[in-house]
């Protein structure tokens, strides 16, 4: 259960801001994730997409393009398409969605404002029982702990997903720190061949699995 671990997580320093410096990565994996998941939805037995798109395909050897998603890091807002709809909103969290359509899965945008002047956003792809969350390239801003916990609570209570996956490139300089951070939060490394995870050897996935039996009892 997310709430049972909330105090322990909020008391941690896992999401402490690092010193500003060299960016840890140069591109977003959200478009690649969307492309891969769409391909798996269309053909579960094939992990490589044959369609072209703005980002690298999951099984492509092409270099990562400089398509970092602005926003989601407390320093701006992404320009969402006109099809974006508000899915949920309260004092802590606002969730908007880009509905699934031909060639693309459902994309969710999580926005929270832990402090009056700080907007934190997370980008995610929803597919079946899994929510895939992109980890930003920049250091986590103040308030990221509370913001991410709100995301987990929403995923558990409203989306009713079985697992939340965080994903980031394996060649990031802060890879060890990210693995340690999310391991502390209860995430586990995903082994190759997982039914919900695209076959992308250069991307690392970690999963948080909800205890649905305990959730139903509550």
From Swiss-Prot:
GO terms for molecular function: ornithine decarboxylase inhibitor activity. InterPro entries: Acyl_CoA_acyltransferase, ODC_AZ, ODC_AZ_sf. Expressed ubiquitously in 24 hours embryos, with highest levels in telencephalon, lens, retina, cerebellum and hindbrain primordia. Ornithine decarboxylase (ODC) antizyme protein that negatively regulates ODC activity and intracellular polyamine biosynthesis and uptake in response to increased intracellular polyamine levels. Binds to ODC monomers, inhibiting the assembly of the functional ODC homodimers. Does not target the ODC monomers for degradation, which allows a protein synthesis-independent restoration of ODC activity. Belongs to the ODC antizyme family. Interacts with ODC1 and thereby sterically blocks ODC homodimerization. It comes from Danio rerio (Zebrafish). One of its GO terms (cellular component) is cytoplasm. SUPFAM superfamilies: Acyl-CoA N-acyltransferases (Nat). This is Ornithine decarboxylase antizyme 2. Pfam families: ODC_AZ (PF02100). Keywords: Polyamine biosynthesis. The gene is oaz1b. PROSITE patterns: ODC_AZ. The lineage of its organism: Eukaryota, Metazoa, Chordata, Craniata, Vertebrata. GO terms for biological process: polyamine biosynthetic process; positive regulation of intracellular protein transport; positive regulation of protein catabolic process; viral translational frameshifting.
